[in-house]
Swiss-Prot record:
<keyword id="KW-0597">Phosphoprotein</keyword>
<feature type="domain" description="Carrier">
    <location>
        <begin position="1"/>
        <end position="76"/>
    </location>
</feature>
<dbReference type="GO" id="GO:0000036">
    <property type="term" value="F:acyl carrier activity"/>
</dbReference>
<comment type="similarity">
    <text>Belongs to the acyl carrier protein (ACP) family.</text>
</comment>
<dbReference type="InterPro" id="IPR036736">
    <property type="entry name" value="ACP-like_sf"/>
</dbReference>
<dbReference type="InterPro" id="IPR009081">
    <property type="entry name" value="PP-bd_ACP"/>
</dbReference>
<keyword id="KW-0276">Fatty acid metabolism</keyword>
<dbReference type="GO" id="GO:0009245">
    <property type="term" value="P:lipid A biosynthetic process"/>
</dbReference>
<keyword id="KW-0443">Lipid metabolism</keyword>
<feature type="modified residue" description="O-(pantetheine 4'-phosphoryl)serine">
    <location>
        <position position="36"/>
    </location>
</feature>
<keyword id="KW-0596">Phosphopantetheine</keyword>
<comment type="function">
    <text>Carrier of the growing fatty acid chain in fatty acid biosynthesis.</text>
</comment>
<protein>
    <recommendedName>
        <fullName>Acyl carrier protein</fullName>
    </recommendedName>
</protein>
<keyword id="KW-0963">Cytoplasm</keyword>
<dbReference type="GO" id="GO:0000035">
    <property type="term" value="F:acyl binding"/>
</dbReference>
<dbReference type="GO" id="GO:0016020">
    <property type="term" value="C:membrane"/>
</dbReference>
<dbReference type="GO" id="GO:0005829">
    <property type="term" value="C:cytosol"/>
</dbReference>
Length: 76
């Protein structure tokens, strides 16, 4: 099972944001300032960290930290 802290570590690494800004409700683009390339890198980082494949269709729906945690928990 993915934990919030593990997902947060990937986000901090890939987006270079302060970990205090990474909350379950935080949106990658609007709140954490990710651009389209960073969003792709974030998804790839999550795939590598958790050993899951996130298809493009699913990646487009993952907009918040909690959505990423939920997707990983449900697909690991």
């Amino acid at each position: 099972m993915a934990t919030f802290d593990d997902v947060k570590d990937v986000i901090v690494d890939k987006l270079g944001v302060d970990e205090g800004k990474v909350t379950p409700e935080a949106r990658f683009v609007e709140d954490l300032g990710a651009d389209s390339l960073e969003t792709v890198e974030l998804i790839m980082g999550l795939e590598d960290k958790f050993g899951v494949t996130i298809p493009d269709e699913a990646a487009e729906t993952i907009r918040t930290v909690q959505a990423a945690v939920d997707y990983i928990d449900n697909n690991q």
